[in-house]
Amino acid sequence: MRSTYKTIGLWVILIVLFVAFYNFFSQGNDQVQEPSFTQLLTKVEEKKVQEVAVKGNTYSGKFTDTSEKFRTTGPAPDAAMLNQLRSNGVDVKYEREEQNSLWLTILGQWMPVVFLFLFFIFFMRQLQGGSGKAMTFGKSKAKLLSESHNKVTFADVAGADECKEELEEIVAFLKDPKKFTKLGGRIPKGVLMMGSPGTGKTLLARAVAGEAGVPFFSISGSDFVEMFVGVGASRVRDLFEQGKKNAPCIIFIDEIDAVGRHRGAGLGGGHDEREQTLNQLLVEMDGFESNDGVILIAATNRPDVLDPALQRPGRFDRRIVVPRPDVKGRLGVLKVHTRRVPLAPEVDLEVIARGTPGMTGADLENLVNESALMAARQNKERVDLSDFEAAKDKVFMGPERRSMIMTEKEKKNTAVHEAGHALLAKLLPGCDPLHKVTIIPRGQALGVTWSLPTEDKVNGYKKQMLDQISMAMGGRIAEELMFNEMSSGAANDIERATETARAMVCRWGMSEKMGPLAFGKSDGEVFLGRDFNSSKDYSEDTARQIDAEVRNIVVGCYERGKNLLTENIEALRRVSDALVEYETLDAEDVNILLQGGQLTRERPPPRVNAPPKATEKKDKRKILDALEGLPAMEPKKA
């Protein structure tokens, strides 16, 4: 409230000063002549003076011919002068002479300076967020989190048990340090959490803040860098000064790769503001001055670009990898996020956990949220299994685009393409089990064939790779067999098949001709601090052999898939016809069709393309009529 009154008062003062400033400088803007006293008397004799106001020795008035004002000084008026003025028809007025106040004179002279000074102070206060300090660019932007602010505990974290144990030990050290120091141990100075986006690194840090019971400072890595040189290093110093004053405490830096990338490499030059900030951070973490009681926790999903000096023991003593959750972890995450969601009795979270391999904690939270939104959209009291299935389809494959207009030819081609993928997924043993196939456009795809593994996979095997390449080419093969034509819809399939084959040859040593060798190195992104001058470690002849081997693998898988689909051409036709009729088939539907059965479930409502409007038909007819009357264009002569 006091801040509001101060702001209102400051605005009132500024407005008053502005009005006074304007009035002061607006005085005398009218055109006023200053003739000599002799010239004034001549004008009087010529009867060109309308009126004269006498104020001491000052004569002011207005001319008759030009209506312009004048002001001049002369001797004190006497009787002869007054008679001369009256005889020439001049209206004479007397005005009392006033003494100017000294304070008014000083105010008029110093008012512009005071106004500019107050305006500058007001501008700086607004620029600095009203902190009242002249310059606060070098101050840390770390936020001190209170215990009651969105409190998260380790009970809210699931799917990362080993990471929780490491961080719980940090919390235990802060609560009872003697338990560890009596045996000569010391508290870790820093903890670096690494993992894919969405695995729960920031959530773990929030859990530490809720459990530690000590001051917790939170800041982002990008908050250190500004356009002013030296600001980042100053903010690092200020951050650790705050930490020392509040020790024991925890400092959390999110996305530390924004400030902790490799030094002295990349296209950005050898020395810049980020490197200066990083150098100061290295000194503060482990320099001559000790930071006892200040624990630094950082999170990043790009550990490969961090500077080696930042990751050494003494700065980050512990490096915790936060992985994607397995089946058990996904079940725990689902239980955490469904605590406030009413579930139908048939919903089995363990089944959902098994059907969502590769999903992170953030993905699962989004899945639960989408399921709840879909149930609410249909006015349901509880979230049932169909809502989870629909949400899973939306998260994995993208939202449906039922309004997209497709011709019958495009629809049939898409059905044949997806039927080729689905049929090879059922026939090849190395492919993941088929889950669903649809020709409803989703995301950027016209159709989707979705396979789900039955368990989490750690390694890939050669036979599986070859089967996956054959399945990826199944869409192109089916188009060739059914229509004797090729479309551009297989572009992404061909790209994935080629990438897999090249990785088999160059990275995994799965080529019999090239042997168990690795060819080439990953150059990395030069802007991320990687080496700019990197070269191939093999000859041009070897490169030609690699290209030939990649081609042999892809073409061999193509021919294998073509033979399988040729042998099962009737099954391919049944699946494609069912896709045209039903638009979406699950694994059970495909099994029925492969066994020669017929589907008996209800058909979806047809998607009818909207007919053109009458006005559109008239406009098109006018254009065609106009074109018929034009002469044919002749080719230009060279």
From Swiss-Prot:
<comment type="similarity">
    <text>In the central section; belongs to the AAA ATPase family.</text>
</comment>
<dbReference type="GO" id="GO:0005886">
    <property type="term" value="C:plasma membrane"/>
</dbReference>
<feature type="binding site">
    <location>
        <position position="417"/>
    </location>
    <ligand>
        <name>Zn(2+)</name>
    </ligand>
</feature>
<feature type="binding site">
    <location>
        <begin position="195"/>
        <end position="202"/>
    </location>
    <ligand>
        <name>ATP</name>
    </ligand>
</feature>
<dbReference type="GO" id="GO:0004176">
    <property type="term" value="F:ATP-dependent peptidase activity"/>
</dbReference>
<dbReference type="InterPro" id="IPR011546">
    <property type="entry name" value="Pept_M41_FtsH_extracell"/>
</dbReference>
<protein>
    <recommendedName>
        <fullName>ATP-dependent zinc metalloprotease FtsH</fullName>
        <ecNumber>3.4.24.-</ecNumber>
    </recommendedName>
</protein>
<keyword id="KW-0547">Nucleotide-binding</keyword>
<keyword id="KW-0482">Metalloprotease</keyword>
<feature type="transmembrane region" description="Helical">
    <location>
        <begin position="103"/>
        <end position="123"/>
    </location>
</feature>
<feature type="region of interest" description="Disordered">
    <location>
        <begin position="596"/>
        <end position="638"/>
    </location>
</feature>
<feature type="topological domain" description="Periplasmic">
    <location>
        <begin position="29"/>
        <end position="102"/>
    </location>
</feature>
<dbReference type="GO" id="GO:0004222">
    <property type="term" value="F:metalloendopeptidase activity"/>
</dbReference>
<dbReference type="InterPro" id="IPR027417">
    <property type="entry name" value="P-loop_NTPase"/>
</dbReference>
<keyword id="KW-0479">Metal-binding</keyword>
<dbReference type="Pfam" id="PF06480">
    <property type="entry name" value="FtsH_ext"/>
</dbReference>
<comment type="subunit">
    <text>Homohexamer.</text>
</comment>
<dbReference type="GO" id="GO:0016887">
    <property type="term" value="F:ATP hydrolysis activity"/>
</dbReference>
<dbReference type="InterPro" id="IPR003959">
    <property type="entry name" value="ATPase_AAA_core"/>
</dbReference>
<dbReference type="Pfam" id="PF00004">
    <property type="entry name" value="AAA"/>
</dbReference>
<feature type="topological domain" description="Cytoplasmic">
    <location>
        <begin position="1"/>
        <end position="7"/>
    </location>
</feature>
<keyword id="KW-0472">Membrane</keyword>
<dbReference type="InterPro" id="IPR041569">
    <property type="entry name" value="AAA_lid_3"/>
</dbReference>
<feature type="active site">
    <location>
        <position position="418"/>
    </location>
</feature>
<feature type="compositionally biased region" description="Basic and acidic residues">
    <location>
        <begin position="614"/>
        <end position="625"/>
    </location>
</feature>
<keyword id="KW-0862">Zinc</keyword>
<keyword id="KW-0378">Hydrolase</keyword>
<keyword id="KW-0645">Protease</keyword>
<keyword id="KW-1003">Cell membrane</keyword>
<keyword id="KW-1133">Transmembrane helix</keyword>
<keyword id="KW-0067">ATP-binding</keyword>
<feature type="topological domain" description="Cytoplasmic">
    <location>
        <begin position="124"/>
        <end position="638"/>
    </location>
</feature>
<dbReference type="Pfam" id="PF01434">
    <property type="entry name" value="Peptidase_M41"/>
</dbReference>
<keyword id="KW-0812">Transmembrane</keyword>
<dbReference type="Pfam" id="PF17862">
    <property type="entry name" value="AAA_lid_3"/>
</dbReference>
<dbReference type="InterPro" id="IPR037219">
    <property type="entry name" value="Peptidase_M41-like"/>
</dbReference>
<dbReference type="GO" id="GO:0008270">
    <property type="term" value="F:zinc ion binding"/>
</dbReference>
<comment type="function">
    <text>Acts as a processive, ATP-dependent zinc metallopeptidase for both cytoplasmic and membrane proteins. Plays a role in the quality control of integral membrane proteins.</text>
</comment>
<dbReference type="GO" id="GO:0005524">
    <property type="term" value="F:ATP binding"/>
</dbReference>
<feature type="binding site">
    <location>
        <position position="493"/>
    </location>
    <ligand>
        <name>Zn(2+)</name>
    </ligand>
</feature>
<comment type="similarity">
    <text>In the C-terminal section; belongs to the peptidase M41 family.</text>
</comment>
<dbReference type="InterPro" id="IPR003960">
    <property type="entry name" value="ATPase_AAA_CS"/>
</dbReference>
